[in-house]
Amino acid sequence: MFRLNSLSALAELAVGSRWYHGGSQPIQIRRRLMMVAFLGASAVTASTGLLWKRAHAESPPCVDNLKSDIGDKGKNKDEGDVCNHEKKTADLAPHPEEKKKKRSGFRDRKVMEYENRIRAYSTPDKIFRYFATLKVISEPGEAEVFMTPEDFVRSITPNEKQPEHLGLDQYIIKRFDGKKISQEREKFADEGSIFYTLGECGLISFSDYIFLTTVLSTPQRNFEIAFKMFDLNGDGEVDMEEFEQVQSIIRSQTSMGMRHRDRPTTGNTLKSGLCSALTTYFFGADLKGKLTIKNFLEFQRKLQHDVLKLEFERHDPVDGRITERQFGGMLLAYSGVQSKKLTAMQRQLKKHFKEGKGLTFQEVENFFTFLKNINDVDTALSFYHMAGASLDKVTMQQVARTVAKVELSDHVCDVVFALFDCDGNGELSNKEFVSIMKQRLMRGLEKPKDMGFTRLMQAMWKCAQETAWDFALPKQ
């Protein structure tokens, strides 16, 4: 009897021991899983604000409602601004050739903020549908949406407001008339412009829009490497099929290409190959020609020149010159600098050039040619910095001559230093200058077209998958 009681007591003791030691591990596992769940919930909560901003860029079908609501609120303020502005201009009595300064009211600022969010976070399909202004109806009755070259520049330039009564899926309707279209060809693009090669009137289709943004957002070196990879016989030329492969690979690496999804409902599908006008331009009428990297890079250079020319003309130059503040605005357009600092930099520029002589297009183009070599410029400026030399205006002009083979005028250097000489000692803040100029060179097209929420969730999911077994297995 005593033996049976002892055995039962030992058995119960063993069961209790197993329950105690076995139950402590699940408790620890549950604590770890609860900690992971808490961190995940915190990350989702922190991302809610980002999603809210994203929703503003995606949800409104057009800006008509926004314009009407904001117009009522800002009507009185706008009228006051206009009245005050008219009084000031009447008192100052400016020169007849001078343009009146156009002040943006509360309503315009809110609309431009909304349009900037569209440029930054929307899909290529929505960007194209919002900033395109023409819908051409063909003789069979089929309709296709087109951009003008000015629309294209506006779609990639921050703070450029879309014309009134034109917005998402709101267009000027034109019926196709071959004779009239041919007569109006020079209305949208000059004969020497690269846009003239795009077909009727120099208009830009959705496929052309994706192709042009790809060309603008891809460095020259990337195209050189891609051409060499598909040049199997080493003659430096590619045929049409090989070029389509080059284009597809390059496009898949850009932010526009990664965000694009074909949308048959809107008609914005990425057609295989290029438009007929571009294929003829690159490969001849029979499409059996060869395209060299030299000819393609010349096409890229002309495109950059024409886009820069359109940007210059948008500032309404007087006697072929734009003001120093307008040039500074071109440099800072894609900087991403906070509004307060941006305002301070513009005020500093206005202080230095109250009665400036302005800048010609040749001076502006020389500086942007200098920017095309910004990586080499960064290296050269770093060498000067390590050698203890000051980065003054003479140094910048020397770097431009050595690296980019262009001459920067003294006046251009004065404007650049007025913007980036923070402490006023006559020396350039090269780190900030180089970082902002790299963004300006790519026109903001290299930035991801999202708020980063998707990438955050993908990283969290990958981390959870890799660490799940570590939480589940007991510690040794």
Swiss-Prot record:
Residues 126-129, 259-263 are annotated as: K/R-ring. SUPFAM superfamilies: EF-hand. Changing residue 129 to A: Decreased ability to inhibit MCU channel activity in absence of calcium. Changing residue 221 to A: Abolishes homooligomerization. It comes from the Eukaryota. It holds the Pfam family EF-hand_5. Ca(2+) 2 binds at residues 421, 423, 425, 427, 432. Phosphorylation at Ser-122 by AKT1 impairs its maturation and stability. This is Calcium uptake protein 1, mitochondrial. The lineage of its organism: Eukaryota, Metazoa, Chordata, Craniata, Vertebrata.
